[in-house]
Amino acid sequence: MKHLNIYIMLLGFSIFTGATFNLAKYTVGYFSPSSSAAWRFGLAAAVMLIILIFTEGIKKSQLRKNAVSYIVLGIIGIFGFNALFFVGLKYTSPVNGALIMGLNPLLTAILARIILKDNMTKKQVLGIFFAFIGVLLVITQGSIETIKTLSISGGDLIIFTGNVCWALYGVLGRRFVKDGTPLSTTTYTMVIGAVSLIVVSLFTSKPVSLSNIPIGVWGAIAFMAFFTSVLGYLWWNQGIKEIGASKTSLFFNLVPVVTMIISFAVGTPIKVFQVIGAVLVILGVLTASGVIRIPKYNTKEQSAI
C-alpha cells in the first residue's frame, strides 16, 4: 500500500494522543494541573528547540517578524489550551475530555469562517450538526433534565474552553504568522507556552516532594512530552507533507476511540451515551471532510455559508 509508513505513523499519533488523556488524569493526582503541564512542555520545548537548531536553524529575521504573533499564539494555544486541559481533567473523565476534543476539526472550521472568511460547504454544516449533537450528548450525560437545568460538568466546560483555545491557535497562526515553517512556529510557540506554564506553576502550585512522586508519574510525563508533544507533532506534519492535510486530519478522530479503549482496559466503565456520542462526533467529522459523501443533484457543490 502506498504511504503505508505514513499511515502507521499517524496511527501512532492517534494512539499517543488518545493515551494522553488517561496519563494526564493520572498525573494531576500527584501534581497540580499547572505543574503537570509545565513539566510536560518544559521537556518538549527543550527537545523541539534542539531539533530546530540542528535542522532549520534559528532565523533571526523570521523571529523578529513574527515575535508578537508567536507570543500571542504561545499564550493562547500552548499555555491556555494545556492549562485548561489539565484543570478540566481533574473534574471530568478522560473519555469525556477526548470526545469533546474530537469536535476540534469542526470548531476550527467555524472559527476559520469567522476570522479567515473561509467558506463552509453543506457537508461541513451537516458534519458540524452531527458532531455538536454528539458532544452535547456527552456533556449532558444523555439526560434531558441536564439540559433543562443547565447542570453540566464544570470539567467538560473547561475542556471545551481549552478546545476553543486550540482551534484559535491554528486559525490565528494561519492569519498572522508570515514566512514561518510549521517546525519553527510550533517550536517558538511551545517555548513561550512552556515558560508561561512554568511561571504560573511556581506561583500557584504547592511545594511537592519530588522523591515521593511514583516512577509511573514521571513515566507518564515523559511519555506526554516526548511521544505526544514531540514525536506526535513530527509525524503529524510528515503526514500533511505526504498525503495532505485533509486525509491527515481524519486520524485525529481516532483519538476518542483510543481513549475509550484504554479507559475500558484499565477498568473504567464506558456508558452507552459516551459510545453514541463518539460515533456521532466521528460521523460528523467524516461527513465534513468528504469521506462520507452526500448525494449531489448538481455538478458543482455550493457554499452553504
Swiss-Prot record:
Domain of life assignment: Bacteria
One GO cellular component, as annotated: plasma membrane
Keywords of the record: Cell membrane, Membrane, Repeat, Transmembrane, Transmembrane helix, Transport
Protein name: Uncharacterized transporter YyaM
Lipid bilayer topology: Multi-pass membrane protein
Recorded coiled-coil stretches: none
Keyword Cell membrane attributed: yes
Subcellular location: Cell membrane
Family to which the UniProt record says this protein belongs: Belongs to the EamA transporter family.
Stretches that traverse the bilayer: 4-24, 38-58, 67-87, 95-115, 125-145, 152-172, 183-203, 215-235, 250-270, 272-292
Chief localization: membrane
Naturally occurring in which organism (per UniProt): Bacillus subtilis (strain 168)
Pfam families linked: EamA
EamA domain segment(s): 15-140, 164-290
